[in-house]
Regions:
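Rossmann-fold NAD(P)H-dependent dehydrogenase/reductase core
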Residues: 4-237
Length: 240
């Protein structure tokens, strides 16, 4: 492992480092599988009340049942959320606010990876390019609609999962929806760069307004999620 790669890892970190989260209300988007599922599983062990925000309710309920098998007293709600549909985002936030009066952590985990093979120019429900629409615009809209309840909750936190792939990206304002030139990797990198810029600007706004919120950006490291099973690295490995 190279020195630069080693910097991406904290080798002695474990789930035991997660602090007590008793009674914390936490939304984890895309938590029916992959990284989001494992985050949800571990934070309920620490006492958090987790809202699994998922596109597929049936899959979400199955994942909830798996968690409850080992943690029967876990507090978990499953609510439908499709980041490719602005109406779904509004419906989700309205339902959440009807049930809860606080939000301690919003974990923006859900997204589309570069390994997913989409038909070029696949649109979201609202007509946006799919990668940019889900990874950035959907996350932006969700965070904005929950910002009022986050402001009301002391020491709340917004965690947005980005990627080091942002270094390969640029924001092409002349072709934001990639109508002229299409490349999965380029569009994915653009969406992750947009996540990064959004997180930075959100942090600046929070500091300027002197709000008791933190905006945190994370690169999850190298992980084999269910989405990456369809991706380049897994397919490459199958050939050897």
């Amino acid at each position: 492992m190279s020195k630069s790669t080693k910097k991406l890892y904290k080798e002695n970190w474990s789930f035991s480092d997660i602090p007590d989260l008793t009674n914390k209300i936490m939304i984890v988007t895309g938590s029916n599988r992959g990284l989001g599922f494992f985050v949800a599983r571990e934070i309920v062990i620490k006492g958090a009340h987790v809202i699994m925000a998922v596109r597929n309710i049936d899959e979400g309920e199955k994942s909830k049942d798996i968690i409850l098998t080992d943690n029967p007293n876990a507090k978990i709600d499953v609510i439908k959320l499709d980041l490719a549909d602005l109406h779904s985002i509004t419906t989700f936030t309205n339902e959440f606010k009807e049930k809860f009066s606080r939000l301690d952590v919003l974990l923006n985990n859900a997204g589309i990876t570069a390994g997913i093979k989409l038909t070029p120019h696949t649109p979201t429900v609202d007509g946006f390019e799919y990668f940019f629409g889900v990874n950035h615009l959907g996350t932006f809209a969700l965070t904005g609609q929950l910002f009022d309840i986050l402001k009301q909750t002391p020491n709340s936190r917004i965690v947005t999962v980005s990627s080091l792939s942002h270094k390969q990206g640029s924001i092409n304002f002349d072709d934001l929806m990639s109508e002229k030139k299409y490349s999965n990797m380029r569009i994915y990198a653009q969406s992750k760069l947009a996540n990064l810029l959004f997180g930075y600007e959100l942090s600046r706004h929070i500091a300027q307004q002197k709000l008791n919120i933190k905006s945190v950006l994370v690169h999850p490291g190298f992980a084999i999620s269910s989405k990456k099973k369809q991706g380049f690295w897994i397919n490459l490995g199958k050939n050897y």
